[in-house]
Amino acid sequence: MPLHLYPDVYASGSVPPGWIPTKGGTIKYPVRNPAVRRHLRELLPGRWQKVIKQGNRGEVHYFEHNSGQVAGVKYYAN
């Protein structure tokens, strides 16, 4: 599974220019899939969370490390 680390969601290239997160539109929960969690911890040891962020023109889904780095960024247009 090809997950790459990025400093933020915009650096991944998946989020279109002009996308702005909606205030209060963020859901965070622990990574439940053991295989994905194991792979993420191989990339960067520590705590990872699954994040779903609502924005002005769609949603962004990604995994976030405690350090703020992200992986597996996907954009879904509304």
PLM region spans:
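Catalytic toxin/effector domains delivered as secreted proteins or via bacterial secretion systems
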Residues: M1-N78
